[in-house]
Amino acid sequence: VHLTAEEKDAVLGLWGKVNVQEVGGEALGRLLVVYPWTQRFFESFGDLSSADAVMNNPKVKAHGKKVLDSFADGLKHLDNLKGTFAALSELHCDQLHVDPENFRLLGNELVVVLARTFGKEFTPELQAAYQKVVAGVANALAHRYH
């Protein structure tokens, strides 16, 4: 991902304020609610029958945190996202058979949740920088599919 020094500083600066448990759970929950076909990958999570059930599901929250912990690892390696996410790309492609479009959808949900969480602090410039990052991560996760 190509970010200017200012974009990188802004992305990392905001990320230091992110509660990965809350933001991760909300982002994954929103993905499962807005794009219900994604729920098929999470059948072992129990009750996903309504928006409330999804958003309050402890397994959704826990997996959302796990996803954002991996995303945070990517932020430390912005110059090598494909290498950073190679094992996860292989897992999601070869074993889980996740449609790679879902990575882009989740990235967009993450940006929405960051905007909701940080309000005016999440400026248009910061949003643009985060869009670059989530697109880069989605591309890295989809790498095995190509």
UniProtKB/Swiss-Prot annotation:
The keyword Metal-binding applies. GO terms for biological process: hydrogen peroxide catabolic process. InterPro entries: Globin (IPR000971), Globin-like_sf (IPR009050), Globin/Proto (IPR012292), Hemoglobin_b (IPR002337), Hemoglobin_oxygen_transport (IPR050056). GO terms for cellular component: blood microparticle; haptoglobin-hemoglobin complex; hemoglobin complex. The modification S-nitrosocysteine is found at C93. Heme b binds at H63, H92. Red blood cells. The modification N6-acetyllysine is found at K59, K82. Residues 2-146 form the Globin domain. Involved in oxygen transport from the lung to the various peripheral tissues. Heterotetramer of two alpha chains and two beta chains. This is Hemoglobin subunit beta. It comes from Hippopotamus amphibius.
